[in-house]
Structures are given as C-alpha cells and as structure tokens.
Amino acid sequence: MLETDYVLAYYHTKPFYPVHIVAVPKKHISSLITLEENDHDLLLELMGIIQKIASMMTEEKSGVITNSGAYQDSKHLHWHIVFGKPLK
C-alpha cells in the first residue's frame, strides 16, 4: 500500500474492519514502550505515513490503534489504521 526505506504499510491479511491497514517500521522494535532515543527519526517517519493514510479516512468511524503488553499479539511495533464498523 505504501513503503519507504524505513516503513511499510500494508492491508491487514485478516481484516477486522472494511479498511484495515497496518503500518510498521522495517527495523525491529518490539513495542512502543521499548523505543530508544535513536529511534525518534524513524518514529517521525512512521507517524508521517500513518497521518497520510489516516487523512484518507476522515469519516466518523475511523481510528489509529497500537497495543502494548498483553494486548500486543505481534511483538513488533505496529499501528492499525482502520475505517468502518468492525466486521466481526
């Protein structure tokens, strides 16, 4: 869907929403709470990609979500950009 040298955004393989996009840094970062100071530029680029995608979905039912701890299934930092009512 969208890719830079450091960030990949793709359509979720098992979507929970009509539009369900996942944005990840290509560098392994396990979660939001493990970010280090030298990751700030990467995080800014990731947020820019998320903002670009989210700006395409301006309806009421949209969101940008990240999880940590027990709620984080994939142990790689990622954000879900979603639109519409949940499918399930």
How should each PLM-predicted stretch be described?
Residues 1-88:
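HIT superfamily nucleotide-processing domains
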